[in-house]
Every structure is written in structure tokens, then in C-alpha cells.
Curated annotation (Swiss-Prot):
Binds 1 zinc ion per subunit. GO terms for biological process: proteolysis. CDD domains: M48B_HtpX_like. It comes from Pyrobaculum aerophilum (strain ATCC 51768 / DSM 7523 / JCM 9630 / CIP 104966 / NBRC 100827 / IM2). Pfam families: Peptidase_M48. It comes from the Archaea. This is Protease HtpX homolog. HAMAP family: Pept_M48_protease_HtpX (MF_00188).
């Protein structure tokens, strides 16, 4: 979500962000701990999706029943126009982003990688053709594209050097899993919802401030609903991030099916081990507009092809600590949790 650049929007954004920080630091870890292990992966995804949709629907219902009567004669038209604009901008981004990614990362076809992608896709029963491309940069991989541009699986040249054949197949399986699960389209849809709620809130506050009070409306009610919407939009954003992390576990199951749980674990462990030794490597990907696509979300450096991981290394990584606070704001789960998840995975 990006605030409109005016003092009111900036102030609301700060209030919402502070609220999100408080939730992430206090309530969210306790809730996550209390429900940990109580749901299957599919149950957790369904529950989180329902919470996102119901919370968004409640705010829209609140606008229609409480705020709309105080928005003047053109309130409904403005409301629908705003929602249409937010949805349209996101759809345009969805269809344009593959071209931007290809340009940004210098994507180029690779016959050897294409052969591996085709083999893994057949193993997973993918019903569509996938385009395999090699890109420059750190050891990473990502899935992008759509039915118009084609569906891509991108692997960096340094990832090719870092992994052996089975580990590479697991990484590719993870990315094909994103395509099979329609994650790009699903996360586009869910990502739109907090943006809609946020901009509805900002607009309501603006209209309340501009109201002269002679139209029969109550600016105070309109402002209160607007502020509440902005705050709740940040809560919805936290839920969307949680949903994204669950989709990553879901994609890991595809990687494990493609090449085995151990291959998926060792691929993740190699990435983790390399970047743990290069803490400065996190900055570039953290600033990337496409970081949510990566198999590993906070990495960037020149990979050392001689990184190796032993079974004892793997077990040590599983036991390593991670920041719960940082996890709540991430699109990807911590590697130790993903390794433990794969341990418990059964086919």
C-alpha cells in the first residue's frame, strides 16, 4: 500500500503503521503460538483467506451503511470509482510486470534449464507450457507471468552453480508449484483488498474535512469510519502476509514432490548458509519491488558455488533462532520453519 502524498494521508499512514507495529509486537506472536499445530496447511490457508475476505467485507459494509449517507449525492459513484481504479491499476501491473521483470533481470532462455523445467513440470503434472529463463544476480529463483505473457520459471546463474541436480529440481518444483497453485493471481487479488480499504479510509477522512456540514451529513461519523478503515487495512495487510507465508509452505510441498523432501531441504539450507555468512546481502532484495516472488526473500550477493551443507548443518539450521517480529512482516517463512515443515510432510 502506498499513501497518497498529502499531509492527511501521511498522518493516517503513520497511525496505521504504528498500530500494525503494536499488533505485530504484542498480539500477533501470541495468536500464532496459540494456534500453532492446530490446523493443517490447507485449514490454515482457508482460515486466513476467510479472515481477509470477511474483514474487508465488513469494512465495505460499514462504509455502505454508516459512511455512505454522510458522503453526499455522489458518494456511491465516487466509492465505486475508487474501487474500480485500485483494481484496474493492479490488473495492469499484473499483466505488465512480466515484461518489466524480463527487462530488469536480463532474462534469457537456456536450453539446459528448459529441459530440466520440462522434466519437473511433467513430473508434477503441469497442464501448461513453462518458459525457463536464466537471470543475473544472487542465488534465487522465482515464478512469474500469466496466460497472456506466458508462465516463466527464472533461476539465477548463481543458483545453478550453488545447487546440484536434485536440489535444482526441488527449487524448480517449488516455483512450478506457484504456477500450479495460481499464486500470482491469488496474491494479486488478496493484495488488492487492503489497498481498497486503505484508500476508502483516506477518502472518507478527506471528504469529512471538506464537508461544510450543510448537506445533512455528519463529518465526525465519516471521519471516524475513515480512520477505522485505515487502521483495519494494516491489520488486513498482516493477514495477507500470513497468507503469503502459507502459500510458500504450499509451494515447498511441490518442490518436495518433484525431487524429494531432502533435496528441498538441502537447497534451502545451502541458500540460508550462504546468506547467513553475508549479512550485507539482504539490502538489495529488501528494496526490490519483486522480492515477494523469490524463493528466498531477503538475499542478494554473488554466490559461492562451493558452499556445501552436511546433515549436521541441516539439523543446526533447524535449531537456529529467528525473529518472530521480522517473520510477521515477511512474505516468506524463516528457513528453519520451512525445514521443520518439510520434516513433517507426508505424501
Amino acid at each position: 500500500m502506498f499513501p497518497i502524498f498529502d499531509p492527511v494521508a501521511l498522518g493516517l499512514y503513520i497511525v496505521g503503521y504504528i498500530f500494525m507495529l503494536i499488533i505485530a509486537a504484542t498480539i500477533a506472536p501470541k495468536v500464532a503460538k496459540s494456534i500453532s499445530g492446530r490446523f493443517t496447511l490447507y485449514g490454515a490457508m482457508a482460515l486466513t483467506a476467510v479472515l481477509v475476505v470477511l474483514t474487508t467485507a465488513f469494512i465495505i459494509y460499514l462504509f455502505v451503511t454508516v459512511a455512505l449517507p454522510h458522503m453526499g449525492a455522489y458518494g456511491l459513484s465516487f466509492l465505486l470509482g475508487l474501487i474500480f481504479f485500485v483494481v484496474l491499476m493492479n490488473i495492469i501491473t499484473y499483466f505488465a510486470s512480466p515484461y518489466l521483470i524480463n527487462l530488469s533481470y536480463g532474462a534469457r532462455p537456456d536450453p539446459r534449464l528448459q529441459q530440466i523445467v520440462d522434466e519437473v513440470a511433467a513430473r508434477l503434472g503441469a497442464p501448461f507450457k513453462l518458459k525457463a529463463v536464466v537471470v543475473d544476480g544472487p542465488p534465487n529463483a522465482f515464478a512469474y507471468g500469466n496466460f497472456l505473457t506466458g508462465r516463466y520459471v527464472a533461476v539465477t546463474s548463481s543458483m545453478l552453480a550453488l545447487t546440484d541436480r536434485r536440489e535444482l529440481e526441488a527449487v524448480i518444483g517449488h516455483e512450478i508449484g506457484h504456477h500450479l497453485h495460481r499464486d500470482n493471481a491469488i496474491m494479486l487479488l488478496f493484495g488488492i483488498l487492503p489497498s481498497i480499504v486503505y484508500y476508502l479510509g483516506v477518502t472518507a477522512v478527506h471528504m469529512a474535512m471538506a464537508s461544510s456540514g450543510n448537506r445533512g451529513g455528519n463529518p465526525a461519523i465519516l471521519a471516524a469510519v475513515g480512520i477505522a478503515a485505515v487502521i483495519v487495512s494494516f491489520l488486513i495487510q498482516l493477514l495477507v502476509l500470513a497468507f503469503s507465508r502459507l502459500r510458500e509452505y504450499y509451494a515447498d510441498t511441490a518442490g518436495a514432490k518433484a525431487a524429494g523432501k531432502e533435496a528441498m531441504q538441502f537447497a534451502l539450507a545451502k541458500i540460508h548458509k550462504f546468506y547467513f555468512a553475508n549479512p550485507e546481502a539482504h539490502e538489495v532484495v529488501r528494496d526490490s519491488k519483486f522480492r515477494a516472488l523469490f524463493i528466498y526473500a531477503l538475499v542478494n550477493a554473488v554466490a559461492n558455488p562451493f558452499v556445501s551443507v552436511t546433515r549436521s548443518d541441516l539439523e543446526e539450521i533447524k535449531r537456529s533462532s529467528y525473529s518472530v517480529f521480522q517473520e510477521i512482516f515477511s512474505t516468506h517463512p524463516p528457513i528453519p520453519k520451512r525445514l521443520k515443515f518439510l520434516d513433517e510432510l507426508q505424501f
